[in-house]
């Protein structure tokens, strides 16, 4: 602050650790009253995050909120020039002085009211999209629901029993679909895609392709757009941890086997007496692997534990071994983990850098070899009838949609919100919101919970 505190237009210059904190906001208001200030410059983080915060401070201080300037010295200086502290500081000083000069030239403004279109576009007909559409319609907005596939429901529409409530996913989605199709304010378009967007926040015009070639189109005026396109599961490459061998299934394939059959477990006509689960397949991969996913998929530990409980219900005598790196059954889901142990599941912790090895035996069975960290790295061999690869979640690539809506995409392929805590569904494109698994790996319950936010933001 010493670099600018003596500038002729500066009356008060202060520094703070967290400018957005309540204590610092109070100091700003007090200085504005004591010094009879008429404008405000804040040099901190992104205006996308805190413009409204400090406009509110200006109002409470008796200033015109439009005679405030936010100077972004975090993203534009501190984070950008981590290897040049001196240069970053000099740049920050120049930016702050530019902000002061800009503020000196501002004039008081008064907000105006602009009519907006009371209709929302929801992209994606999975469980998050269905719930978002219903939530928006229930507060009186017209909704256009666009689904790329021929049917609604997404991945959850193919699920059987789900945790922790045990409800059937297909039945749950079927009820949601009936509610959506019966609602007078919701228009459902399947086999449809968003082709283009024009206009501005509150008054967008979107073009929807109604056939695969995009020849037949429809245009809708919408005030906001909610993206709920979901995610997909990781597909192992052939040979990865034995994938492609008889008796090696991914977790979704194993779950389908449980949902679609009854009686004693069998695989290819052979009884299943021993199951080995290998965790973190397609998640927490080494950064050097091309196309690898370094993130944790979060939901799959609990999903695997739940599947093991279902298998134990089918055959209480089945032996189940879980080869995990870290067990992340967070919150109340730890109760499922405890229950699975009580029912006989054995959990063996394996090292990050030495994954299990799956071998096909001449007898047709499988053998899984791994080092158990809980026994100081002792190598163990597990004869198994079935190996389940606990696969994670990956982003559903959609370059055309990203281009049409100008969606912000992270390095992991998921769509980015402005801030995970403060603005969890807003994107940098005003009026374009995201919810569900298109943001990050999450289970269906979390996807449904987050869908309530778009209605809050759309209605202000």
List the predicted regions and their residue ranges.
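Residues forming the flavin
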Residues: 1-460
